[in-house]
């Protein structure tokens, strides 16, 4: 049997920019954030509660829905902010917003916390910690174009 070995060049690290890494981390955070809320609808009794105008201990009002949308909008906006702001401001904003969302993520576990919610919270916390780490260690010299 004659097998030819094809010589392939070694894989090359492309050096992804920090701001693109941050945008990717915020995107992952958003997917988890949204899916936890979506899967919440499959929990027994939750749709009935929503139809009666309650979510957890809160009445479903315009104010509640505005606050819920605002809490989702901030991480969604961070995807764009991470690639649009200048480095110095970008670094600060990412560290501050991620730090604020750490306790917020934990507070979302108040009351009834199912295993899928605990798993998502752990994954969200890991993503938020990576956001803080990458922003904190932002390179002084640009490594990408």
Language-model features: locations:
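Membrane-helix boundary connector in multi-pass membrane proteins
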Residues: 90, 102-120
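Membrane-water interface at the C-terminal end of transmembrane alpha helices
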Residues: 126-145
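Structural signal for membrane-spanning alpha-helices in multi-pass inner-membrane proteins
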Residues: 79-82, 105-108, 131-135
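Central hydrophobic cores of alpha-helical transmembrane segments
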Residues: 93-101
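Interfacial helix-start motif at the membrane-water boundary
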Residues: 57-74
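Hydrophobic transmembrane helix segments
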Residues: 29-62
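Cytosolic juxtamembrane helix and N-cap/initiation of the first transmembrane helix
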Residues: 2-32
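Juxtamembrane helix-break-helix junctions at the cytosolic face
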Residues: 72-92
């Amino acid at each position: 049997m004659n097998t030819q070995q094809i010589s392939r060049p070694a894989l090359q690290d492309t050096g992804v920019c920090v701001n693109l890494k941050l945008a990717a981390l915020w995107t992952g955070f958003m997917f988890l954030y949204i899916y936890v809320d979506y899967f919440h609808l499959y929990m027994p009794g939750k749709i009935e509660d929503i139809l009666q105008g309650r979510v957890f201990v809160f009445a479903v009002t315009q104010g509640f829905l505005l606050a819920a949308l605002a809490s989702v909008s901030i991480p969604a906006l961070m995807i764009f902010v991470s690639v649009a702001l200048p480095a110095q401001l970008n670094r600060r904003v990412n560290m501050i917003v991620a730090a604020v969302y750490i306790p917020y993520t934990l507070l979302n576990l108040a009351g009834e916390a199912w295993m899928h919610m605990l798993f998502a919270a752990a994954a969200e916390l890991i993503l938020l910690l990576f956001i803080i780490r990458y922003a904190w260690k932002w390179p002084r010299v640009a490594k990408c174009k």
